[in-house]
Amino acid sequence: MGVKFLKILVCGLFFWSLNAHLWGKQDNSFLGVAEKAYKSGNYSKATSYFKKACNDGVSEGCTQLGIIYENGQGTRIDYKKALEYYKTACQADDREGCFGLGGLYDEGLGTTQNYQEAIDAYAKACVLKHPESCYNLGIIYDRKIKGNADQAVTYYQKSCNFDMAKGCYVLGVAYEKGFLEVKQSNHKAVIYYLKACRLDDGQACRALGSLFENGDAGLDEDFEVAFDYLQKACGLNNSGGCASLGSMYMLGRYVKKDPQKAFNFFKQACDMGSAVSCSRMGFMYSQGDAVPKDLRKALDNYERGCDMGDEVGCFALAGMYYNMKDKENAIMIYDKGCKLGMKQACENLTKLRGY
């Protein structure tokens, strides 16, 4: 009787093991087909197979459905469906699902904005070692729920520990400026900037370049090191890094003066949104410096700089309109330059208005 029972038990366990093995393979098969279809842009087929995987308990399938409905890939955007699929995935300890869920609560998409729900979802993902969720928790405690600076620092630190460059950079700024209620520490600021820059954060490389260029934060002036960091920042599409390199070449500061290189760096920076670089291009076109003199291009670039908030660009643009006998535009642009804080623009505005 005991032997017979043992045989039944062994056969039962074998059957259960085989069934579980086959069931797992079926899940993986669904997921594999779905992922292949998704990569090829066949979202209809991908959705169908992700649903099969999700229904069979494969959390990745649920997460992918959340992504599909959140972004409207092959279907209309449906945040409510995305929310439900992310919830299912998060309940199964899928960190990407928790991250997606946190994002919807954070932004109030498909549901009422709820920072506490966002915190709960992000916190679970953070525990599951999801760097961006830790970082987003830092953002919430830093900027959205006031009076939680210590929590913000804690989660920025966790994201940095997980090699999230943005988290390291924010901590660098905090220690350099004494923000987030931390004790100002140049030493710590440099350590965090260095890590962030090694992780290819352009802002951090730009910050290091400035510190070495000016001998700030207890660092000795080292123009060669500064140049290298600024060059890396520019290569990482940081407009400030490119703008600084442009200034170096324009003025011949620490490098041989080279107006053409200066112009090229200013153009890069301007195209990335550096207002002052657009204005400097305007000046170079107005003077014919490294480029043929072209007042139309000068005006266009001053206008770009002014539109992005550079008071010098506004002042120069207003001057061009004045010289073109366009008093109305000159007054309007001087007024803008004045509001941006340029005293001379205010003085010229007063003269043009006659009071």
UniProtKB/Swiss-Prot annotation:
EC numbers, comma separated: 3.5.2.6
Q: Where in the cell is it found?
A: Secreted
TPR repeats span 27-60, 63-96, 98-131, 132-166, 202-240, 245-275, 276-311, 312-344
Question: Where this protein primarily resides, as one coarse class?
Answer: secreted
Reaction(s) catalysed by this chain's protein: a beta-lactam + H2O = a substituted beta-amino acid
Keyword field? Antibiotic resistance, Disulfide bond, Hydrolase, Repeat, Secreted, Signal, TPR repeat
Q: Name one GO biological process term.
A: response to antibiotic
SUPFAM superfamilies assigned: HCP-like
Q: What molecular function does GO assign, one term?
A: beta-lactamase activity
- Alphabetical list of InterPro entries matching this protein: HcpB-like, Sel1-like, TPR-like_helical_dom_sf, TPR_rpt
Comment field (misc): Antibodies against HcpE are present in sera from human patients infected by Helicobacter pylori.
Protein function: May hydrolyze 6-aminopenicillinic acid and 7-aminocephalosporanic acid (ACA) derivatives.
| Protein name, UniProt field | Putative beta-lactamase HcpE
Recorded source organism is Helicobacter pylori (strain ATCC 700392 / 26695)
Q: Tell me the classification of the organism that encodes this protein.
A: Bacteria, Pseudomonadati, Campylobacterota, Epsilonproteobacteria, Campylobacterales
